[in-house]
Design a protein with these regions (language model features):
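A structural detector for beta-sheet-dominated domains
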Residues: 7-9, 41-43, 75, 97
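Catalytic domains of carbohydrate-active enzymes that cleave complex glycans
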Residues: 160-162, 179, 184-287
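Acidic/polar low-complexity surface segments
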Residues: 12-16, 36-68, 111-124, 195-201
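Short beta-strand-centered aromatic/proline hotspots
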Residues: 1-7
Length: 287
């Protein structure tokens, strides 16, 4: 916004015939508030059990769904946080929904969820509408999509130093066309690909995504319209074939992403922290 004219100022003007600009106000959002230092434990029925296998591991688990599904949900808020929280037997530890920006979720554990393992279950840390959301140093166990961005979510959004164990599926941009995501020093499976007719016909799931110095099995491709990047994946042998290519052989377009230093970590150790240091100095990183 130009200080002299109070009108929007665009640094790189572009002609977009279908675009409009509108004044935006966040006056009614919750701001400068947080949830911290909590342990959330949900009761559940132990009458139902189920078995499933994923990536060569057999699991037996409780299958009750008549209990708490979400630990903390953020919506219509800015400059907010969730930290030092542990949830037990709950599908989603933290859900970020629409109208959220400048949010931090850190040092949160999502443990031993109780539910089925089909669609829309065990999305431990999910972003379905937040922008400028930082997830850092979080942990999920017995998860499906541990660290996930849903469809049409506009970034930038960051997952930093997060970890998943005993996954039924992958950390990933999910559904259709979320943009501007960074997975940085994450330990766990990460898939960025054309999901084709998977789920509810997801198609291209992520655009302008970057994977940086991660560890674990991975898939990465890009659409013809937006680049995705991979830097410093720990082991080239962790690359997997595109999942949906096996469903409809030869008909699922997945174009090679921009890849650098596959099999060898890169310097700096963290892309996000280096950019933070460059912008705000070492004090911001130490904080």
């Amino acid at each position: 916004m130009s200080a002299s004219t109070s009108r929007p100022a665009i640094s790189s003007p572009q002609k977009e015939p279908a675009s409009t600009a509108a004044r935006f106000s966040s006056a009614r959002r919750v701001a400068h508030a947080g949830v911290e230092n909590l342990q959330l434990i949900s009761r559940f029925s132990k009458k139902g059990t189920a078995q499933n296998s994923a990536f060569g591991v057999e699991y037996k688990f409780y299958d009750d769904e008549c209990h708490a599904q979400v630990g903390v949900r953020l919506g219509n808020a800015e400059n907010v946080w969730v930290r030092r929280l542990t949830s037990y037997h709950i599908d989603v530890a933290v859900s970020v929904s629409g109208g959220v920006r400048w949010a931090t979720v850190q040092d949160v554990n999502c443990l031993e969820p109780v539910s089925g393992t089909g669609g829309e279950r065990r999305y431990s840390f999910t972003n379905s509408g937040g922008t400028l959301v930082l997830n850092q140093r979080n942990y999920a166990r017995f998860t499906r999509h541990g660290f996930i961005v849903m469809g049409n979510v506009m970034g930038p959004n960051v997952f930093l130093a997060d970890r998943t164990d005993y996954q039924f599926d992958a950390n990933e941009p999910h559904l259709r066309w979320s943009t501007g995501g960074l997975y940085d020093n994450v330990k766990g499976r990460i898939y960025v690909q054309n999901r084709w007719n998977n789920g509810t016909a997801h198609g291209w799931s992520g655009a302008n995504y970057t994977l940086y110095n991660n560890e674990g099995k991975f898939i990465i491709s890009q659409s013809p319209l937006a680049a995705n990047y991979l830097f410093g994946q720990s082991d080239a042998a962790d690359r997997l074939p595109f999942v949906m290519a096996e469903v409809d052989p030869g008909n699922v377009p997945n174009y090679k992403a921009c890849e650098y230093s596959v099999g060898r970590k890169m310097t700096p150790q963290s892309l996000y922290l280096q950019q933070l240091r460059d912008r705000l100095g070492p004090e911001a990183v130490a904080a």
